[in-house]
């Protein structure tokens, strides 16, 4: 009976911790919770068998992602033909897949405890966690949503280490603190004290580095840039009867832009209500607007190349269309169907599934105001792709997106929360234009200085600092993710042939 009650208590604590950790992300932003929310899982993994630890980790990870990704249910409810009892299925399946990686970390901690020691397992826990995040962000096209470090996007002093090690550097510090606290529960006091001491040094270094970077003067060169947020409801965006009303909203907003004297005007993803290059009259209107405002227009539109549709950003000046970038990283089950021959039937289930062709290369526009790159929609949540633009010479980055599919849920806010890390990783300003929000200006220190909120129609202009230096992350990329993968592989492989002690419990 006692074992049963212990199991119930463990389940309650683990699942409560997972639920609370999900609330660290927008909109609740309880950003302190990840500093301790993994303690129950890590501690339990050191006293349970690898199989049991995996199951507990998978269950807690699945709950974490189910809570975090609950906003996706809105999209399925409004824009799909999936019967309501089944519309939670896609979210739960995705959560269950992502939860596997949490289970893998718990399994590895238990395995290393059994083969070596709990002290070593907890010391390696930050590497195990980052390796799992790296794999989740790369395998099968990658899904890095919910990376633990993103929970700290408002704690600007903490996230400055992203310049050195990316968002995974912040995840590493968070898990190190959790592992040290778990050590206080399961280790002898000398071992626990050593772990706390090492983690204290790591945390102090993180905060000290952040303080130094935040005290530095901003880049000397800046340029005024305007964001337009038209706030067109998704059902109306492609409605032919609404096209003229949409354009009326656009050009009414543009009349407010001329007084701002910007160097660049940024519109959202697929802002053009028609296929732009097939609509010479619309191209001419934007060309004339660029001439009137005295600044280029960066405009999102669907385009057709050799009979295939693409998601494109066009640069329009008084000379017409002078540049383009075609989106490279397409959204699975949004812009294409993976394994189309097998899963193609899902196209009939949802309005939001398109069949687009991916672009082939990153493009850096020459400006004005300076060389800049564009990531479209969720391309910016992939650090490797974002880095390509900066390495190719971009000193300013633009994100154009259309998060209207997610309504007034937490989805658009969670999407925004990832971009402060891209800014810090490369010390580059980010100009983010979203159809229905959240549009924002983000400084090279990751501070969101101005924003237009969800479904707020308007324009805003800000003097945007231009990148002045290359960072370690720009030069080396996600070295910590690769190092963590190597450490994890070596640790598990190195213990594979050792005999597992019988002392580790099986339940």
Which residues does each PLM region occupy?
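Soluble catalytic domains of enzymes that build or remodel membrane lipids, polysaccharides, and related
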Residues: 212-476, 480
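Membrane-embedded alpha-helical bundles of multi-pass enzymes
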Residues: 1-214, 407-408, 419-422, 434-436, ...
């Amino acid at each position: 009976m006692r074992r049963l009650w212990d199991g119930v208590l463990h389940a309650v604590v683990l699942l409560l911790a997972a639920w609370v950790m999900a609330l660290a992300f927008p909109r609740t932003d309880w950003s302190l919770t990840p500093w301790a929310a993994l303690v129950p899982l890590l501690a339990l993994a050191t006293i349970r068998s690898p199989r049991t630890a995996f199951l507990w980790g998978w269950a807690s990870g699945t709950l974490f992602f189910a809570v975090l990704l609950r906003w996706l249910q809105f999209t399925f409810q409004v824009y799909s033909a999936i019967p309501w009892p089944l519309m939670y299925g896609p979210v739960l399946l995705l959560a269950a897949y992502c939860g596997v990686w949490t289970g893998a970390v718990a399994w590895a901690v238990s395995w290393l405890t059994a083969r070596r020691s709990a002290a070593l397992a907890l010391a390696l826990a930050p590497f195990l966690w980052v390796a799992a995040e790296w794999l989740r962000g790369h395998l099968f096209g990658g899904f890095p949503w919910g990376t633990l470090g993103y929970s700290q996007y408002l704690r600007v002093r903490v996230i400055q280490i992203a310049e050195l090690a990316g968002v995974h550097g912040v995840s590493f510090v968070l898990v190190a603190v959790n592992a040290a606290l778990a050590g206080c529960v399961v280790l002898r006091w000398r071992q626990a004290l050593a772990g706390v001491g090492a983690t204290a040094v790591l945390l102090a270094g993180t905060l000290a580095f952040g303080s130094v970077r935040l005290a530095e003067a901003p880049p000397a060169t800046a340029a005024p840039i305007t964001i337009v947020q038209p706030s067109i409801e998704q059902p109306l965006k492609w409605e032919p009867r609404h096209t003229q009303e949409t354009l009326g909203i656009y050009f009414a907003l543009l009349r407010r832009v001329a007084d701002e004297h910007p160097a660049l005007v940024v519109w959202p993803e697929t802002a053009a209500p028609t296929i732009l290059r097939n609509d010479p009259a619309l191209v001419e209107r934007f060309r004339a607007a660029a001439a009137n405002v005295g600044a280029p227009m960066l405009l999102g539109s669907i385009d057709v190349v050799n009979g295939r549709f693409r998601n494109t950003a066009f640069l329009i000046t008084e000379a017409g269309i002078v540049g383009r970038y075609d989106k490279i990283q397409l959204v699975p089950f949004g812009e294409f169907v993976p394994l189309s021959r097998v899963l193609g039937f899902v196209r009939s289930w949802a309005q939001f599934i398109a069949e687009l062709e991916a672009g082939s290369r990153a493009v850096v526009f020459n400006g004005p105001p300076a060389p800049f790159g564009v990531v479209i929609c969720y391309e910016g949540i992939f650090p490797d792709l974002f880095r390509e633009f900066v390495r190719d010479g971009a000193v300013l980055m633009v994100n154009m997106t259309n998060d209207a599919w997610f309504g007034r849920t937490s989805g658009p806010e969670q999407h925004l929360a990832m971009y402060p890390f891209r800014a810090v990783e490369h010390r580059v300003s980010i100009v983010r234009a979203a159809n229905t929000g959240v549009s924002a200006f983000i400084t090279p220190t990751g501070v969101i200085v101005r924003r237009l909120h969800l479904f707020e129609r308007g324009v805003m202009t800000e003097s945007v600092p231009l990148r002045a230096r290359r960072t370690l992350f720009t030069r080396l990329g996600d070295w910590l993710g690769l190092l963590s993968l190597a450490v994890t592989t070596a640790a598990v492989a190195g213990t594979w042939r050792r005999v597992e002690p019988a002392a580790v419990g099986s339940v």
